[in-house]
């Protein structure tokens, strides 16, 4: 596995005004990559997109950290431009989503990042009466984004989000996969966030199974939105499933809030997940549990 951290959870002052702190911290704890949020709307502390790209390109080279993904924020609660936020279910706000995502795709291309996150934010409640129209807007919008991303050698990862934050529409791996298949695009995959999955999925294994073969990226935070191990997600089962399906993408850790503090959350997260990965690989060997293979 490759391990990354979602930088925005360190706070905006660090992420935009003193980002070298993030790079130094992640190298000290053995991370492979950093996940960034572009400076847009209420995010950025006045840093321009040009400054953001130049600074992170320099730091990524200096610290030999990959940039695992660029993650725009979606949904009314998190979108940088709330309340006039982007969605994937209504034409005008979907056009905004397309413009914003293309801008982020350009940044990802400059920074050498393979992925940009997209999510389903809804414009109004979805019901049996309007679901077909919403799906049509989402599919058309995703196709437009994917066509642009393909020209930049960037892929999009579609994050499955819980219904309390994004509304009842496309909340499960199975429904994300259905929507992706409707687009017909090869550069659109799935991003699991284990906090959201805890609301929507039957269990960890079935979530990973349903996402195949489109599981390209993941966010690791626990059921209480804290660092892995601080809640009750069965991350050993998660790791066994990932090993079984030969997952080779990033495991991006996040914690919101940074409990009990940044250093402990960052250190405990990667230490615990690496232990879970090690145990998973041991449990799947033919010698387990007797010490010899039959």
Q: What positions do the PLM features span?
A:
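Acidic/histidine-rich catalytic cores of soluble enzymes
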Residues: 33-34, 39-40, 70, 133-240, ...
């Amino acid at each position: 596995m490759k391990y990354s951290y979602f930088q925005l959870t360190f706070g905006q002052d660090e992420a935009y005004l003193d980002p070298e702190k993030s790079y130094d911290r992640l190298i000290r704890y053995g991370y492979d990559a950093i996940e960034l949020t572009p400076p847009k709307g209420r995010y950025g502390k006045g840093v321009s997109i040009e400054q953001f790209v130049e600074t992170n390109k320099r730091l990524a080279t200096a610290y030999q950290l990959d940039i695992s993904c660029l993650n725009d924020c979606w949904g009314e609660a998190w979108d940088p431009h709330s309340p006039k936020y982007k969605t994937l279910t209504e034409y005008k706000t979907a056009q905004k989503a397309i413009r914003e995502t293309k801008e982020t795709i350009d940044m990802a291309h400059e920074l050498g990042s393979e992925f940009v996150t997209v999510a389903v934010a809804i414009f109004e409640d979805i019901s049996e009466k309007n679901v077909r129209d919403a799906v049509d807007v989402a599919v058309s919008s995703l196709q437009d984004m994917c066509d642009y991303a393909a020209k930049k050698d960037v892929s999009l990862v579609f994050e499955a989000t819980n219904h309390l934050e994004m509304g009842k529409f496309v909340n499960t791996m199975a429904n994300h996969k259905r929507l992706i298949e409707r687009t017909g695009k090869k550069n659109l995959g799935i991003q699991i966030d284990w906090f959201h999955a805890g609301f929507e999925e039957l269990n960890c294994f079935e979530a990973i199974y349903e996402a195949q073969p489109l599981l390209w990226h993941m966010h690791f935070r626990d059921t209480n939105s804290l660092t892995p191990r601080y809640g009750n997600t069965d991350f050993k089962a998660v790791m066994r499933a990932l090993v079984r399906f030969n997952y080779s993408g990033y495991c991006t850790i996040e914690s919101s809030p940074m409990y009990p503090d940044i250093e402990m959350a960052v250190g405990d997260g990667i230490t615990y997940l690496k232990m879970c990965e090690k145990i998973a690989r041991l449990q799947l060997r033919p010698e387990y549990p007797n010490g010899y293979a039959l």
